[in-house]
């Protein structure tokens, strides 16, 4: 069974019995409104018993009626923007859709929770050439809970959905006229959310920061990056660009915060979670590192004059990249379906629900967080000084890689503290990020040289010239030397005394 995806950009409005839709011709190039008739829709929404999908702004439904009958999974992207992943109509939840929310459900059953019967009156908003700009629909909705309780609700709402590739100015112009006519932006992001609210069966609200203690700020940071990790999970399963990188970054930030803020959270509880985050980051790194290295080497080859690309260089790199990518992606997807990974997600939830706070957590953030940031900074300074004192070679490469890791932890610690400490923490994070970038480029060169050597050996063994591979190796060697020279300058900027005044 296959699934396809559609990016949905729409706005919802609340209306009433005495409100009439305004004339829309002339707004943002709308030349005509075409009546497309009324369609009867029957949608059953699925969720866990504790409404985990609804709490995350996700909806999963089985709908009949209309032109797109089938299963629809809607994943939030941004305000007014969702990705709708579709699967053919069938009785049970399609496995491709269930897989996309596995990080949310973690084995909990997806069962019917709400049924919505809608009469949809559709109008197409067209330009002078008859091109569809947007679709406006007036939905008269009847909602019924399916958990055995008598909850029911009825309402009417208006939706305006932008046509594929359309201009957001159309939505803005239509909204201006709708609001002038008395319509108001809907309080609920989806029909399911409205149905749950009107029947008293609301999803659990997201916890918000309620104070300015060290514990408040650290937990707020952790909560944001657990959310980022879960959002990236679905993106990785869909093989979206940069998704593995985003998931890996969320994993690193969480692990770094747990280690940097041990004065706030009891390490007896957080160290095991940090170890599991380290495991996950390592597994994700196989896929991400392959992706980064392929892009780097491809760019190097593309920049060479054709006269210096001797032999089947591009073909050999393509075969190497395809084989590595296939294996890496399969391994990543397998990891996301393991009990170990799902147990890690449970552990993160437990950490946020019942945090192991230490006495320092109750103190003002401005007193506790600077110490943690400066401790990470001191570790970074020691590692940079050690690396710069070593002669060029493998030992220095390893020391620079260790300094890179310390730079990440310092940057993440400063970013976590920035909401409480303001500009000084943000400034330190920016300067350390520059150091991290130089060290990251250096490490990428170290990895690239090892791969280029292997590719050269294989090319030679196959009777091909290794000239181009050697040339690329030399370029990477020169690049690493340049990054080492550059490090002194960026480190001087990041080690200015005023930056340590948090």
Regions found by a protein language model. Name each.
Residues 1-502:
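Cationic, histidine-enriched alpha-helical/coil surfaces that engage anionic ligands
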């Amino acid at each position: 069974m296959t699934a396809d995806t559609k990016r949905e950009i729409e706005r919802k409005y609340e209306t009433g019995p005495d409100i009439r839709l305004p004339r829309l011709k002339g707004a943002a190039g709308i030349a005509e409104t075409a009546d497309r008739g009324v369609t009867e829709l029957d949608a059953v929404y699925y969720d866990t018993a504790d409404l985990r999908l609804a709490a995350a702004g996700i909806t999963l439904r089985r709908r009949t009626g209309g032109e797109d009958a089938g299963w629809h999974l809607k994943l939030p992207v941004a305000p007014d923007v969702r990705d709708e992943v579709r699967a053919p109509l069938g009785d049970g939840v399609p496995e491709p859709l269930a897989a996309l929310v596995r990080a949310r459900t973690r084995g909990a059953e997806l069962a019917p929770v709400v049924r919505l019967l809608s009469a949809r009156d559709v109008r197409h908003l067209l330009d002078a050439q008859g091109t569809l700009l947007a679709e406006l629909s007036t939905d008269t909705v009847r909602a019924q809970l399916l958990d055995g309780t008598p909850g029911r609700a009825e309402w009417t709402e208006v939706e305006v959905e932008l046509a594929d590739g359309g201009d957001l100015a159309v939505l803005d112009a239509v909204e201006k006229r709708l609001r002038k006519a008395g319509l108001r932006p809907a309080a609920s992001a989806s029909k399911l959310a409205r149905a749950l609210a009107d029947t008293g069966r609301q999803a659990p609200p997201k916890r918000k920061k309620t104070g300015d203690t060290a514990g408040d700020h650290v937990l707020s940071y952790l909560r944001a990056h657990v959310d980022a990790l879960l959002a990236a999970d679905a993106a990785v399963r869909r093989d979206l660009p940069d998704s593995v990188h985003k998931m890996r970054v969320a994993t690193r930030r969480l692990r770094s915060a747990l280690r940097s803020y041990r004065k706030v959270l009891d390490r007896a509880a957080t160290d095991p979670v940090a170890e599991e985050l380290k495991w996950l980051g390592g597994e994700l790194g196989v896929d991400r590192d392959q992706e980064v290295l392929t892009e780097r080497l491809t760019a190097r080859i593309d920049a060479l004059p054709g006269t210096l690309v001797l032999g089947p260089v591009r073909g050999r790199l393509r075969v190497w990249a395809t084989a590595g990518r296939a294996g890496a992606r399969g391994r990543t997807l397998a990891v996301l379906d393991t009990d170990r990974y799902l147990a890690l997600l449970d552990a993160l939830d437990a950490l946020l629900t019942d945090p192991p706070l230490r006495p320092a957590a109750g103190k003002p953030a401005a007193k506790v967080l600077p110490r943690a940031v400066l401790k990470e900074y001191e570790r970074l300074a020691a590692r940079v000084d050690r690396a710069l004192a070593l002669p060029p070679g493998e030992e220095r490469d390893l020391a620079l890689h260790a300094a890179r890791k310390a730079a990440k932890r310092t940057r993440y610690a400063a970013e976590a503290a920035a909401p409480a400490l303001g500009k000084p923490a943000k400034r330190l994070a920016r300067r350390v990020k520059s150091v991290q970038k130089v060290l990251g480029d250096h490490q990428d060169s170290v990895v690239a040289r090892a791969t280029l050597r292997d590719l050269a050996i294989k090319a030679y063994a196959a009777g091909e010239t290794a000239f181009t591979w050697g040339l690329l190796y030399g370029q990477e060697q020169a690049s690493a030397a340049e990054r080492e020279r550059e490090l002194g300058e960026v480190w001087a900027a990041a080690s200015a005394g005023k930056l340590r005044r948090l």
